[in-house]
């Protein structure tokens, strides 16, 4: 499978765009992405939107694209979804069609220079192809979206640890998220140790006190 491949199903009707929402960057119609992966992608897309002039990445999955080409269907999804800033047209759609055993990505005009045909084909091959052949769609989607996001950050001169943001280890501005539960548990352990030491000191003092 390559990003530039064009598949068609002549006997099938044109597939309609389904499941998209202006409040979500995930449309998992094929039900192939885990909740953790959806959260990972959403976190990255939100960070892009906040730090890269409204840029967004959307992941759209389906079984088949009907008698559309992959390129044509991805463009329809892109137009219907309206990802990215309207004035900069800096959205990106990753289309994954499992029944057709193919994938495609379409950038908005504002990102076309950064994602030329060869660049985008190489990016998809390097980050999605190996996982795709194993039907490990979660890993493929994560790696591909991360690679896209890092390139978009380069376009806007933004330095963010997108993997940490996607994983929830950093917020959308890149600040490390403290694990309050671990801090709470650590404080409780420290308190217990101090109490144990104090009690031990008191017991030793009592034992050393001369009998009257």
PLM feature segments, named:
Residues 187-208:
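Selective detector of the "anchor" transmembrane alpha-helix that sits immediately C-terminal
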Residues 2-12:
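C-terminal segment of classical bacterial N-terminal signal peptides
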Residues 211-212:
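Short hydrophobic helical membrane-anchoring segments positioned at the boundary
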Residues 13-188:
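Folded, non-transmembrane soluble domains that reside on the lumenal/extracytoplasmic side of membranes
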